[in-house]
Amino acid sequence: MNIHEYQGKAIFRSMGVAVPEGRVAYTAEEAVEKAKELDSKVYVVKAQIHAGGRGKAGGVKIAKSLSEVETYAKELLGKTLVTHQTGPEGKEIKRLYIEEGCDIQKEYYVGFVIDRATDRVTLMASEEGGTEIEEVAAKTPEKIFKETIDPVVGLAPYQARRIAFNINIPKESINKAAKFLVSLYNVFIEKDCSIVEINPLVTTGEGEVLALDAKVNFDDNALFKHKDIQELRDLEEEDPKEIEASKYDLSYIALDGDIGCMVNGAGLAMATMDTINHFGGNPANFLDVGGGATKEKVTEAFKIILGDENVKGIFVNIFGGIMKCDIIAEGIVAAVKEVELTLPLVVRLEGTNVERGKEILKESGLAIEPAATMAEGAQKIVKLVKEA
């Protein structure tokens, strides 16, 4: 689950992570009133959307007067902001964060992530703040420093100080930076985050260490422990199809292609998308029906896939382990009839009760193209979509 910058900063502030003062506003008039509450001569007007790259896209403005705050607020509210993370459709700006300006001396990047290779939380930092960390990793990887954290000990003060030294935090601010990083680590652990990222972290002319940004994602599997965080969810920022999928315990992520995919298991889903790409197709989605799919679940999965008007064909790739192939086949037949599917459909089944599953598909009399392997299925759906 993602949250807005202003929500992330509120969490930071409550747990001892230093951030500038700021207020959220929903209208231009409210933006001016909120700016008046801040003891500042310079204001930062920030678009609040669930995407990075806002600054480069024109979603962050520096205002030197209340009249400029109003001008920028009117300019941004209601605008569709397109960044490298939103896709070409962009996201509508429905709220702003009005923040006090500060005397920035230097910008840095810091982030806590889960390193799958070490099964540990890892602190990453760089003195190349203000730019995308992926860009830094590609061009100057030597400027990224990492600390792997022992889950029993937590982020040790010496590790925090070492990172601060490595990214050239001024000597007089080293201890503040180390304390800042330890507090940020506590946010990551106590709130069950999957990522906490600040870009930029800054040092000021007064020697302060502040978070000028806040990207916080939470582990969905741990949200049941955090009712307060669940309340921060902004459904307007999420894909309606993803919201609908979550109601049926389906994992759905929309992509830019035209071949709908329905698979069980995240690994098989990714392999399926890779195979479609390999044969010249473009997946329209990632959709994992999980290990306990029912007829109802399969039907809803079809409806969600077909909710994307770009979809021109569907590839169902199921390995029946716990989930039996005959049950899946019955679900596919029922779903095709209910949604009155007219698009090309290729189905590859393998595993428990696979022969019975294939018989059910064949006996249905529906236009379902069978495939014996994932590669064959991918080739067939790519060909059918191109011929359609």
Swiss-Prot record:
PANTHER family: SUCCINATE--COA LIGASE [GDP-FORMING] SUBUNIT BETA, MITOCHONDRIAL, SUCCINYL-COA SYNTHETASE BETA CHAIN. Belongs to the succinate/malate CoA ligase beta subunit family. Residues 9-244 form the ATP-grasp domain. Mg(2+) binds at residues 199, 213. One of its GO terms (biological process) is succinyl-CoA metabolic process. It is an enzyme of class 6 (ligase). One of its GO terms (molecular function) is succinate-CoA ligase (ADP-forming) activity. One of its GO terms (cellular component) is cytosol. Binds 1 Mg(2+) ion per subunit. PROSITE patterns: ATP_GRASP, SUCCINYL_COA_LIG_3. The keyword Cytoplasm does not apply. InterPro entries: ATP-grasp (IPR011761), ATP-grasp_succ-CoA_synth-type (IPR013650), ATP_grasp_subdomain_1 (IPR013815), Succ-CoA_synthase_bsu_CS (IPR017866), SUCC_ACL_C (IPR005811), Succ_CoA_ligase-like_bsu (IPR005809), Succinyl-CoA_synth-like (IPR016102). Succinyl-CoA synthetase functions in the citric acid cycle (TCA), coupling the hydrolysis of succinyl-CoA to the synthesis of either ATP or GTP and thus represents the only step of substrate-level phosphorylation in the TCA. The beta subunit provides nucleotide specificity of the enzyme and binds the substrate succinate, while the binding sites for coenzyme A and phosphate are found in the alpha subunit. Substrate binds at residues 264, 321-323. Its cofactor is Mg(2+). Its EC number is 6.2.1.5. ATP binds at residues 46, 53-55, 99, 102, 107. Keywords: ATP-binding, Ligase, Magnesium, Metal-binding, Nucleotide-binding, Tricarboxylic acid cycle. The gene is sucC. Pathway: Carbohydrate metabolism; tricarboxylic acid cycle; succinate from succinyl-CoA (ligase route): step 1/1. It holds the Pfam family Ligase_CoA. It comes from Staphylococcus saprophyticus subsp. saprophyticus (strain ATCC 15305 / DSM 20229 / NCIMB 8711 / NCTC 7292 / S-41). This is Succinate--CoA ligase [ADP-forming] subunit beta. Heterotetramer of two alpha and two beta subunits. It comes from the Bacteria.
